Amino acid sequence: MSDAVIELQNVVKKYDKIAVVNNLSLEVKKGEIFGFLGPNGAGKSTSINMMVGLLKPTSGNILFNGKDSSYLDEKEIGICPQDVVLWNNLTCFENLYMIGKMYDIPKKTLKERILVILEKLHLTDKKDELVSSLSGGMKRRMNIAMATIHNPSVVVLDEPSEGLDPQSRRLLWDYILHQKELGHTVILTTHLMDEADMLSDRVAIIDHGQLLKLDTPKKLKQIIGNGDTVQLELDNSEDNTKIINKLKGISDLNNIFEADEKIILVLLDAVKKLPDIIHLVESNDSKIVDISIRQNTLEDVFIELTGRQLRE
């Protein structure tokens, strides 16, 4: 028996004969955080809107728990749109109470649930304040609270961190991970590499309405090879050519070159090899003034697959 909550089978969506989603087939598994990663206009939002029944595909099939999605019970889905949708003239508590009553949540249960959600999203002290007085980050958190007040089994988040500062983003991520702890399935669209990498169990990289790759973040990054990027800046850039020639003997080196007067190395287990790199540089009468290491990112994968950066 399949563990897929949502299944797309050769789904196409066209507007004026232009395919914005083109022959998309994938499965979202129960209890996972599933990320759609791609630039704006890639077809991410259209795909999730079809998944939850807000749009009908031009062709293809969409199944929810093995059944045609037209039979979907709206109480099973919580949707957090990219745009903030709140009643500005009501308090935070009143917003959640109103939406909870629409889902027929018993009064006592609803009040208790509102307090828990506000605490989880660090909004307890804003409970009785008008939504219109909240900051942008707080409104984003309220948006997710509204989408999850009825305890849906599937939570859909469209660009949840758009425009947020790092602190608000971290609070939002913690709440998304909490949804997984509750056993819920989370589907999110994002163009932020760190968000997709940090949160997602699996990531679908999508561009021009087509699925390019689908796998775990770790396996996706292995597409461009197992390795780290080391950047060296010497006190005298005229030594770069000499040092590059010396560093070519480092084991597991995949690439080495000069860029912006810095030396760039791509190699396996870079952290373990740092002492050897530093020793080799210093033993050749050069001095390192700056050194950094970073791992391959999902944006590197996107560049490998499309030949361009994610935000282009």
Language-model regions: role of each:
Residues 60-75:
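Conserved ABC transporter NBD signature motif
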Residues 155-158:
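Catalytic Walker B motif of ABC-type/P-loop ATPase nucleotide-binding domains
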Residues 174-268:
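ABC transporter nucleotide-binding domain
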Residues 97, 101, 108-126:
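Conserved ABC ATPase "signature" region
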